[in-house]
């Protein structure tokens, strides 16, 4: 997508190519089904640098070699193509920003900021302060939107946290989506949104019809290179997305919400009633 509108009804900010489809595919299906305009902005759309040989880069590139190719150019070209296909299913626009995934970011002297798998879910590196500032400026220059959606940061992935922080600086009125598949880890949602702090937040449940859930599943299935990261295959993908929808329904029912008889799944977004932020770099 090369031409953009001046205004969108819904603007979703996605840390990686597949995050918004995984977390919000059902609600986007619903938005576009009634004629609302949607733009999905993928933050880490930059071409990986050649020659970076950290542990995590080597592991992921070996896994992706068959589906994405072995060169940085091939990897990003295929991932962008998957993104366009996924949101073509949902009839949403796509924009790729030119920021590096955390696994490719380095210090000025070339040392990886996040060299190992566990580092992606650890503490922020102070070197990412400049990334947050630059990303906030880029996000502030996006088209106007009726509603902006940011990742809540469930699971603690560095890129999700960077995206949230930058988005909070760029936009005044935002809602937060629950980051799937990290929501499936017991306690992960509570870690970023403690039960004791729920009074500071207001949740909204988006109920999904069978058609919307199927549309979401088809969208996520477009990320063929990533399926093995979270699922054993397409059948497992469909089953787990349905399981996630049932998790949200169960949570809504526990909170006293009336579940429509036609709902086969759900997604949930959150609005802040009071200031609540992720821990700072210094903490």
Question: Can you name each region flagged by the protein language model?
Answer:
Residues 172-194:
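Short, flexible loop segments at boundaries between secondary-structure elements
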């Amino acid at each position: 997508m090369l031409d953009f509108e001046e205004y969108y009804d819904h603007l979703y900010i996605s840390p990686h190519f597949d995050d918004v489809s995984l977390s919000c595919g059902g609600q986007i299906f619903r938005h576009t089904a009634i004629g609302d305009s949607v733009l999905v902005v993928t933050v880490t759309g930059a071409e990986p640098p050649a020659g970076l040989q950290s542990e995590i880069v080597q592991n992921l590139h070996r896994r992706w070699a068959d589906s994405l190719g072995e060169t940085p150019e091939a990897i990003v070209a295929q991932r962008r193509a998957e993104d366009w296909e996924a949101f073509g299913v949902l009839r949403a626009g796509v924009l790729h920003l030119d920021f590096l995934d955390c696994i490719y970011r380095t210090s000025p002297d070339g040392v990886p900021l996040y060299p190992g798998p566990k580092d992606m879910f650890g503490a922020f590196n102070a070197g990412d302060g400049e990334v947050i500032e630059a990303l906030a400026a880029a996000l502030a220059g996006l088209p106007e939107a009726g509603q902006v959606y940011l990742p809540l940061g469930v699971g603690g992935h560095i890129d999700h946290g960077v995206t949230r922080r930058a988005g909070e600086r760029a936009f005044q009125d935002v809602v937060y989506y629950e980051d799937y598949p990290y929501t499936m880890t017991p306690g992960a949602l509570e870690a970023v949104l403690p039960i004791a702090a729920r009074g500071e937040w207001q949740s909204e449940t988006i109920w999904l019809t069978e058609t919307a859930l199927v549309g979401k599943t088809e969208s996520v299935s477009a990320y063929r290179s990533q399926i093995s990261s979270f699922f054993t295959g397409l059948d497992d993908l469909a089953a787990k997305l349905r399981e996630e929808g049932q998790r949200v329904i169960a949570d809504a029912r526990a909170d006293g919400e009336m579940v429509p008889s036609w709902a086969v799944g759900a997604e949930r977004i959150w609005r802040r009633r009071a200031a609540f932020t992720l821990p700072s770099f210094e903490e």
